[in-house]
């Protein structure tokens, strides 16, 4: 005999039911299926069956005609029973018992209404295992008895820690709720009073169906009355659930006259329990959605125009969306903003949540304003005008938040660091500096900045152009780029100053210092007389002829040959002349000699007194100069001027002239 297997799912129960009908698969009807379910309130359910559509493939088709043939796959029928909203039968009462007005339909289990953890398992399935052998009333009564026992055991651990005396005005969540009460799409009215009439727990199997339904309707009316009183308690529910993390739902109206296409790619989510909704996969440039900017990839599509997708399968939603897009006129899209696509835990904070990370810059400025430790400079508070100092204008222009784009730029494959475009400079001046009646005046001001050196062209052009790159060349920038070691290669000739010796330290021997030192007092031993030093009094020095011997000494071995010529020629004199030795102390430095008579003529008692070494008494007025003929120990040998080749003595007169007035003639050319 032919037999048909029907597998049907009840609400959100994970385990399906199997019944066998003694009817051939091609002849089974909805009436045959309802006859098997005589112990269930079939009039309170909608019947959906697995079917095949030519356009969309496998779909869930609703069949309500009792004489309609049921679609069959591989000799069996797959069905889903969905509770009808507002049904006041035993099944409707049982749905009321699970604390939801409208349980989420099976197709949308993965949508925004399902906020349970993956480990959540409803307890209703265990209480309905024997449903086939019971009447609808007996099943409801036994279910309520189990709930009453569990409520008595868990009375001490009520939701939110409210005491027993407050349970008339507080809400509670039964642990065996058949559907989630934590969904963000459910309002606070979903949480009903956990106290119920004791009479419903004492119903026996002899209770008539009408009596049970009347009691449930009375309880339902009372619950609706409480809904208005407890509407403001939803936000006070436990913060450990998703109830306080409701999604941000927005409605966007798009004008399709300006944009020819919608510009979205949709993605459908499905699992073993049904479809989970339509989501925005990606957004194409140039479309109406991209021009609006409020809809982002990952948002869930809830409604298009007046068509709600909540109770639709993914295939039906796609079909409706295609029909609406093909029509003319504006399109309204209602979407739920997505959460963080990469959550670190199950409970995540929505992206539009007002809690934001701390901005360090804003925190620093706020703290400075409160403490007063970092007052804002007067430079930023005073408005800039055409009468302001150019240096001030340029410094404000260089601030990081000035609004002028200063960055590294490429020109002819050359990187120009911290450069600006001339047009940006003119626009910034015209916007931030008061007093310009038209942009042409701001351009003239920028040209004056270039002329005064505050702006500098890459190739040092003096005419201002708005298409050229410029860098800041003001004094502040130049000073900031200076380096004490810039240009020092170790072999270049530089004029530097040596450090003064410590007053308490003895004077070292055999070293040359660029200062005038007095002769030693008579009490000092002769060993103190360093051949490298000589002192000239202003009354005894005289210029001598070229045939005299040189009283100076040289210690430079890195001096260029031309400088060596001038040094040796200028250092000539006889044994009675005194020379003033001045030299830098850096590496690679040289001695510069000056005749004593020129020094004495241009000096004053004050200048002479300032040249004495610290820590030593000034010389006696009658003290004569100590002059040692010959070079210092370890230095090059000293030769007479006659022994110098004639070609090396030509610059003697010019060097002496330069030393006579060094402030006027000295030019250091490396």
UniProtKB/Swiss-Prot annotation:
InterPro entries: DEP_dom (IPR000591), Dishevelled_C-dom (IPR024580), Dishevelled_fam (IPR008339), Dishevelled_protein_dom (IPR003351), DIX (IPR001158), DIX_dom_sf (IPR038207), Dsh/Dvl-rel (IPR015506), PDZ (IPR001478)
Protein name, UniProt field: Putative segment polarity protein dishevelled homolog DVL1P1
Disulfide bridge positions per record: none
Bias (Basic residues): 142-151, 215-228
Gene symbol of the encoding locus: DVL1P1
PDZ domain segment(s): 251-323
Residues of the DIX domain: 1-85
Entry GO terms, CC: cytosol
Organism: Homo sapiens (Human)
GO biological process: canonical Wnt signaling pathway; heart development; intracellular signal transduction
Family listed: Belongs to the DSH family.
């Amino acid at each position: 005999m032919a037999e048909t297997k029907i597998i049907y799912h009840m609400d959100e129960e994970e385990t399906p039911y199997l019944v066998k009908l003694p009817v051939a698969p091609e002849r089974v009807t909805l009436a045959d299926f309802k006859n098997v379910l005589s112990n269930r309130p079939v009039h309170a359910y909608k019947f959906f069956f697995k079917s095949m559509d030519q356009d969309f493939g496998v779909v869930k088709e609703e069949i309500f005609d009792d004489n309609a043939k049921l679609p069959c796959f591989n000799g069996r029928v797959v069905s889903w029973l969905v509770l009808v909203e507002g049904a006041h039968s035993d099944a409707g009462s049982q749905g009321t018992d699970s604390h939801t007005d409208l349980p989420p339909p099976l197709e949308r289990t993965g949508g925004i209404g399902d906020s349970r953890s993956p480990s959540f398992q409803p307890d209703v399935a265990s209480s309905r295992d024997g449903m086939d052998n019971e009447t609808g009333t007996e099943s409801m009564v036994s279910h309520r008895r189990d709930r009453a026992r569990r409520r008595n055991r868990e009375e001490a651990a009520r939701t939110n820690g409210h005491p027993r005396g407050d349970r008339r005005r507080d809400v509670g969540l039964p642990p065996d709720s058949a559907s989630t009460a934590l969904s963000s799409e459910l309002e606070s009215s979903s949480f009903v009073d956990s106290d119920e009439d004791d009479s419903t727990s004492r119903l026996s199997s002899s209770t008539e169906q009408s009596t049970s339904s009347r009691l449930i309707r009375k309880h339902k009316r009372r619950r609706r009355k409480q809904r208005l009183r407890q509407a403001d308690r939803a936000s006070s529910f436990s913060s450990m659930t998703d109830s306080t993390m409701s999604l941000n739902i927005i409605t966007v109206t798009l004008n399709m006259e300006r944009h020819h296409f919608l510009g979205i790619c949709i993605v459908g989510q499905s699992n073993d329990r049904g479809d989970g909704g339509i989501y925005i996969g990606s957004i194409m440039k140039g479309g109406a959605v991209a021009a609006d900017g409020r809809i982002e990839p990952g948002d869930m599509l809830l409604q298009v125009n007046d068509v709600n997708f909540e109770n639709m399968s993914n295939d039906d939603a796609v079909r409706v969306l295609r029909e609406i897009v093909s029509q003319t006129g504006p399109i309204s899209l209602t979407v739920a903003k997505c959460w963080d696509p990469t959550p670190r835990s199950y409970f995540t904070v929505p992206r539009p949540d007002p809690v934001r990370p701390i901005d360090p810059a804003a925190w620093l400025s706020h703290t400075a304003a409160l403490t007063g430790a970092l007052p804002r400079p007067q430079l930023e508070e005073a408005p800039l005008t055409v009468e302001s100092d150019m240096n001030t204008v340029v410094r404000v222009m260089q601030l990081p938040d000035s609004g002028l784009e200063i960055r590294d730029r490429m020109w002819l494959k050359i990187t120009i660091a911290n450069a600006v475009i001339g047009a940006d400079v003119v626009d910034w001046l015209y916007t931030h500096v008061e007093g310009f009646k038209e942009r042409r005046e701001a351009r003239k001001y920028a040209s004056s900045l270039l002329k005064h050196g505050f702006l500098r062209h890459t190739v040092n052009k003096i005419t201002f152009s708005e298409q050229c790159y410029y860098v800041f060349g003001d004094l502040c920038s130049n000073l900031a780029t200076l380096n004490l070691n810039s240009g020092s290669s170790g072999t270049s000739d530089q004029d530097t100053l040596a450090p003064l010796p410590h007053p308490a330290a003895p004077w070292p021997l055999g070293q040359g210092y660029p200062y005038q030192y007095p002769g030693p007092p008579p009490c000092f031993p002769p060993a103190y007389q360093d051949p490298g030093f000589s002192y000239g009094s202003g009354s005894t020095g005289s210029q001598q002829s070229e045939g005299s011997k040189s009283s100076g000494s040289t210690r430079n071995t890195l001096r260029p040959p031309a400088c060596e010529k001038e040094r040796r020629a200028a250092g000539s004199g006889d044994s009675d002349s005194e020379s003033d030795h001045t030299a830098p102390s850096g590496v690679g430095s040289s001695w510069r000699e000056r005749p004593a008579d020129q020094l004495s003529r241009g000096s004053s008692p004050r200048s002479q007194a300032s040249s004495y070494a610290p820590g030593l008494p000034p010389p006696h007025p009658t003290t004569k100069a100590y002059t040692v003929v010959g070079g210092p120990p370890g230095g090059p040998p000293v030769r007479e001027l006659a022994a110098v080749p004639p070609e090396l003595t030509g610059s003697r007169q010019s060097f002496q002239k330069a030393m006579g007035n060094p402030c006027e003639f000295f030019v250091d050319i490396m």
